[in-house]
């Protein structure tokens, strides 16, 4: 019984990895059908539906992976790092690095892969970015407690500006067909971004 469960879990992971790879390829800029996905995995469409009731559920699973990866690591950054600017830098670098290492999933983060899918999926990505923005804002608000001095500009404005930088770099990565990596020249870009944090 345990072997059967493991085989089923492995097949599910194989399906999700194939979907992510298809999103990374030139197919990712077009609608991915279950027929194409089944062919990529080497199974029938019926076999896909034994593991996932719908393609939407496959995207849900990929979004869950994105959420878990980013939120878990953000929490680790907040636990380990106490300096506000360093925290913000590490969170931005985390988002950009995650996108760079997972090009197919970046198409989901930017919404490109979800254009032909249910609106609910885009809503989940919107909620993820809202959670990250709230976290950035909280980090900024804690600066006054931790360091004795807050920002002169509104934290809501600063957090949205920081997140817009991340979204812009991820969008550029997708638009360039993954040529312009989000972390390219990060060490030169970060001082420009950090200078806005006043």
From Swiss-Prot:
Gene3D superfamilies the UniProt entry points to: Tetracycline Repressor, domain 2
* Single Gene Ontology BP annotation: negative regulation of division septum assembly
Q: Which controlled-vocabulary keywords does the entry list?
A: Cell cycle, Cell division, Coiled coil, Cytoplasm, DNA-binding
Q: Cross-referenced Pfam families, in alphabetical order?
A: SlmA-like_C, TetR_N
Q: Where in the cell is it found?
A: Cytoplasm, Nucleoid
Q: Which residues form a coiled coil?
A: 119-144
Q: What is its main location?
A: cytoplasm
What would you give as a GO molecular function for this chain, any one?
Answer: DNA-binding transcription factor activity
InterPro entries recorded? DNA-bd_HTH_TetR-type_CS, Homeodomain-like_sf, HTH-type_TetR-like_transc_reg, HTH_TetR, NO_SlmA, SlmA-like_C, Tet_transcr_reg_TetR-rel_C_sf
The HTH tetR-type domain covers 10-70
Got a GO cellular component term for this one?
A: bacterial nucleoid
DNA-binding region located at which positions?
33-52
Q: What biological function has been recorded for the protein in this entry?
A: Required for nucleoid occlusion (NO) phenomenon, which prevents Z-ring formation and cell division over the nucleoid. Acts as a DNA-associated cell division inhibitor that binds simultaneously chromosomal DNA and FtsZ, and disrupts the assembly of FtsZ polymers. SlmA-DNA-binding sequences (SBS) are dispersed on non-Ter regions of the chromosome, preventing FtsZ polymerization at these regions.
- Please give the subunit comment from the record: Homodimer. Interacts with FtsZ.
Identify the NCBIfam families for this entry: PRK09480.1
The UniProt entry's sequence similarity note says:
Belongs to the nucleoid occlusion factor SlmA family.
Q: Which PANTHER family does the protein's record reference?
A: HTH-TYPE TRANSCRIPTIONAL REGULATOR RUTR, NUCLEOID OCCLUSION FACTOR SLMA
What protein does this entry describe? Nucleoid occlusion factor SlmA
Which species does the entry assign this protein to? Answer: Klebsiella pneumoniae (strain 342)
Upper lineage is: Bacteria, Pseudomonadati, Pseudomonadota, Gammaproteobacteria, Enterobacterales
What gene is this protein a product of? Answer: slmA
